[in-house]
Structures are given as C-alpha cells and as structure tokens.
Amino acid sequence: MSTEASTGETPEFQSYDHRGSPTQEAMKREIQSLIQNLVKLSRTAPAIHVLIPPEIVMYVEGSRNPDIYNREFVETVQRMNQMLKGRSEALQALQAQIAHQLQIAIPEMKDDIERAVEATGGKVPITGITLDP
C-alpha cells in the first residue's frame, strides 16, 4: 500500500537550486549539446576501426566492468609466465645435469658437449662439481 493511499496526502517533490526558466534553459542547452555529440559520434563511428576482443564485448554486455576483465587477464598472464619460467629453469637444470653426466661418462666429448649446450643458451657446469640430482 502506498503512502499516498494510507495517509490520503499527495507526495511532495522537492527541488534544490531550481530557478525556474534559467534552469530549464540550461537543461535544454545541455540536452541539445548531448544530442549533437551523440550524432557526431554515430557519424564518425563507422570510420574508426578498433578491434575489440569478443570476450570484452561479452563481458560488457553482461553488465560487467572491463577493468576487472583486464585485471583478471593480467593476473592469468602473470601466473602462466611464472609457470613457464619454472619449467624453463627446470629444463635448464636438466640440461646442465645431463651435460655434466655426459662429460663424466665420455670425457673425450667434453668440447662437443660444451658447444652443444652453449649453442642452446645453456651453461655447462664446471667439471668436478657435483650437482644435486
């Protein structure tokens, strides 16, 4: 049940800083300016080609904030980078371990092993130093 029906009074509306005609004219100018800007925007939009990923469009259409999408995307990329960095470091350690073991097992191939490892960006451990398995 509404307040009007229960009290029998009509609701009151208050306006702050309304100065009659000058306020209406200012509001009219603002609305006209908004309409003109929207018309300009709709005319220039076809000439501007910006590729927006469909995921972001769907995110916005679902009334979600694209800044949150960006933050989640950056966090995902950081996690993946950390994971790949860990894998890369593990493979480098494996390469060094294999090179070290090959140098011990086949000492006459030491120079070839060093060249192969260095050609792939790795470093050969100094012979005589044992690496943890």
Swiss-Prot record:
Function description: Component of the Mediator complex, a coactivator involved in the regulated transcription of nearly all RNA polymerase II-dependent genes. Mediator functions as a bridge to convey information from gene-specific regulatory proteins to the basal RNA polymerase II transcription machinery. Mediator is recruited to promoters by direct interactions with regulatory proteins and serves as a scaffold for the assembly of a functional preinitiation complex with RNA polymerase II and the general transcription factors.
Q: What is this protein called?
A: Mediator of RNA polymerase II transcription subunit 10
Start-end of Polar residues biased regions: 1-13
- Native organism is Phaeosphaeria nodorum (strain SN15 / ATCC MYA-4574 / FGSC 10173)
Q: How does it assemble?
A: Component of the Mediator complex.
Q: Name one GO biological process term.
A: regulation of transcription by RNA polymerase II
Report biased composition (Basic and acidic residues) as residue ranges.
Answer: 15-28
**Chain segments annotated as coiled-coil in the UniProt record:** none
Keyword Transcription found: yes
**Which Pfam family, any one of them, does this sequence belong to?**
Med10
**Which InterPro entries has this protein been placed in?**
Mediator_Med10
Q: Where is this region: Disordered?
A: 1-28
For this chain, the family text in UniProt reads: Belongs to the Mediator complex subunit 10 family.
